[in-house]
Each structure stands twice: as C-alpha cells, then as structure tokens.
C-alpha cells in the first residue's frame, strides 16, 4: 500500500478538513518548478491583456492570498538567528504585511532549515541552478527534505543560511519572505532573486499595467536618505 511520509501527515493535519489546501500545499512544493513555469505562462498572458480591466479584482484577490515581504539583510539575519519559536498572528501584523490574508509570522523550531534550487531562477533566463530558496522551521523544511530531492534540497545551519543571503545580496539580489494561504498563511520560505528573474516581481510588473497599485510584494518599510 501507499505509505504517507511524516511530513505529509503533518501538512494534512495542519489543514484539517480543507483538503483543497492540503492538495495545493503538496502540489506547490512537490512540483515546485512546473508550478512556477505554469505561473509564468499566466503572467506572460496577463502582460498582453492589460486592457481587460474586469480582471483587476481577481488579480487583487490572488495577491491577498499569495504575496511577499521584501527583507533588508538585517531583518533576514534576525530570522536566521532565532533560537526559540516565534508566533505573531494578530491583525496588527497587517501594518507590516498589508494584505487581508496570509500575514502570520510563525516559526516553529526555526533552527531547522533547508535550502533547495530556486524555481524562478531555473524558469527564467539565464536559467541558473542556484541553491538559494530557503525554508525556515521544522514543518516546511522537513517536507522539502522528504519530497524535494530532485530540486537538490538539503539541510543547512543558520550560519549557512545567513551566508547564502549575504552572497546573494552582494550580487544585487533582493530577499523576500513569502506568504501563501494554501501553505498555512504564514511565512517560512525566504528567497533571493533579481527583478528580472523573479516570478513575483514579474507578476507585479505585468499587473501594474492593469492598475499601478497592484503589487504582489510589500516594501521593506525602510527608505534611503542621501546626504548632500
């Protein structure tokens, strides 16, 4: 018979009666690269039909359920240096993650970290295989380690995670924390991409042709002042 892996049982329990979310969660990570490539097809199509304004509410609804928060290096480092569980789930989070859904900040056993190949970097030019997509917390990292060998998933230390982020920043990449209703509505995935090879940045660029206020990414909350 079929033997369900422990990490699969974990996400099944997490979603309870919402089998639809369990299936979405499972497919999203187990078929990470095909999922991202399919998203890219949709983005390229939307880029050509920005005249179709009735799509704006649908795009906004999607972004309210799947979005990212840009992180400055110092904030990313704080996450990777956590030595105890962190739970911040109140509506006050919306001040820094300004979306209706998926704004919980939850890290259970944050020292348990995995990394795998970034699906965006493999789907977009120059089609690089870069091991820089990071999962923080036992639940999500265990799932990656049990299901994502084909994407070179491996366990890493907190120090190694900081090193990956720092190396990516030095080459002009932007770090984001991702939130998705279908994966529990909380952060856990942190990745670094350039705007030209990141699905979320490309989605924002395409959908801002519909409405300039549409964005899948929330800003870091910091601004730069230049003394003259």
For each of these PLM feature ranges, what is it?
Residues 3-132, 162-171:
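N-terminal, charged low-complexity regulatory/assembly segments
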Residues 99-101, 174-180, 205:
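Glycine-rich, charged/polar anion/phosphate-binding loops
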Residues 118-120, 132-133, 191-193, 198:
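Disulfide-bonded cysteines in secreted/extracellular proteins and peptides
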Residues 133-140, 177:
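Extended, non-transmembrane interaction/recognition domains
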Residues 146-182, 188-197:
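Compact structured core domains
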Residues 172-174, 196-219:
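Activation/maturation switch segments at domain boundaries
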Residues 178-185, 209-228:
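Ferredoxin-like iron-sulfur electron-transfer modules
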Residues 190-201, 223-228:
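Cysteine-centered iron-sulfur cluster-binding motifs in ferredoxin-type domains/subunits
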């Amino acid at each position: 018979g079929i033997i369900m892996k422990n990490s699969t049982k974990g996400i099944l329990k997490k979603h309870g009666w919402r089998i639809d979310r369990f299936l979405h969660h499972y497919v999203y990570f187990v078929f990470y690269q095909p999922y991202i490539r399919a998203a890219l097809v949709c983005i390229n199509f939307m880029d050509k039909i920005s005249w179709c304004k009735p799509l704006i509410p649908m795009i906004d609804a999607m972004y309210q359920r799947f979005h990212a928060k840009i992180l400055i290096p110092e904030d990313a480092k704080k996450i990777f240096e956590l030595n105890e569980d962190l739970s911040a789930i109140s509506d006050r989070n919306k001040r820094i993650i300004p979306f209706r859904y998926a704004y919980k900040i939850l890290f259970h056993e944050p020292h348990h970290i995995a990394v795998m190949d970034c699906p965006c970097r493999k789907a977009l030019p120059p089609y690089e295989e870069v091991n820089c997509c990071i999962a923080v917390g036992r639940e999500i990292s265990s799932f990656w380690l049990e299901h994502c060998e084909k994407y070179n998933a491996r366990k890493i230390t907190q120090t190694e995670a900081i090193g990956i982020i720092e190396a990516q920043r030095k080459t002009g990449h932007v770090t984001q924390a991702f939130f998705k209703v279908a994966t529990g509505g909380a952060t856990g995935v942190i990745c670094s991409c350039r705007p030209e090879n990141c699905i979320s940045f490309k989605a924002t660029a395409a959908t801002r042709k519909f409405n300039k206020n549409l964005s899948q990414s929330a800003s870091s909350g910091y601004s730069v002042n230049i003394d003259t």
